[in-house]
């Protein structure tokens, strides 16, 4: 299944100029994908900006189902040192926000899949940050009795998610 083959609906662009800019930028894509991208860009300056910033990646990822694209974006953040983690997570956040929005607006995913994907990425982000920061503190000798083997478990640190995060219902608000 490709992204285009799974589309069931398209948003109507509020800003025709923004939609036209995206149609021109992505003129090489399938007509249905252009409808989705144009409608999305014409309703969300934020998502339009991501489309333009991540155009090369987006073209490649639209050949796959959204699950594969989102997993690829999330995976790119794993195994990084704390110095590189922040920028990698910001890039992954942009990419995942865009793909989740397109899957939602294109009718590919139900609401539970949308909120689940956002929650899963938030969970991964917190996990990666805790482990990277714990690793830094272990290297600095600031966690007595903890060694490199303890990084995988966050040296026993617990992050408790409640509310929307705990219920797996994170959204864009």
Placement of each model-derived feature along the sequence:
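Non-catalytic regulatory/linker segments of enzymes
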Residues: 1-173
